[in-house]
Amino acid sequence: MSEKEKSQAQSSVIEEFGFPAEVIQILDRTGVTGEVTQVRVRVLEGRDKGRILTRNVKGPVRLGDILILRETEREARKLTTKR
């Protein structure tokens, strides 16, 4: 298998399952009961490799965790405090 075929096979696997991203910062908790955590992630592979996104994550998360993102287009809104 040539290098070109390997890279095409790898890119199709990434697009099929999602894009890996590493948690680099935990921002805050959100949601009615605080069940969602807003985090900053760095995309590790794909066309947006190196891009830093803000995403909402449900469940336990720590710095350095690897998340699989279905898409890298959308970003979470910034959290605002109610007065």
Swiss-Prot record:
GO CC annotation: cytosolic small ribosomal subunit
Xref: Gene3D superfamilies: Nucleic acid-binding proteins
An individual GO BP term: ribosomal small subunit assembly
Superkingdom of the organism of origin: Archaea
Keywords assigned: Ribonucleoprotein, Ribosomal protein
InterPro entries per UniProt: NA-bd_OB-fold, Ribosomal_eS28, Ribosomal_eS28_CS
Gene Ontology MF annotations: structural constituent of ribosome
Residue pairs linked by disulfide bridges in the UniProt entry: none
One Pfam family matching this protein: Ribosomal_S28e
Family: Belongs to the eukaryotic ribosomal protein eS28 family.
Protein name per the record: Small ribosomal subunit protein eS28
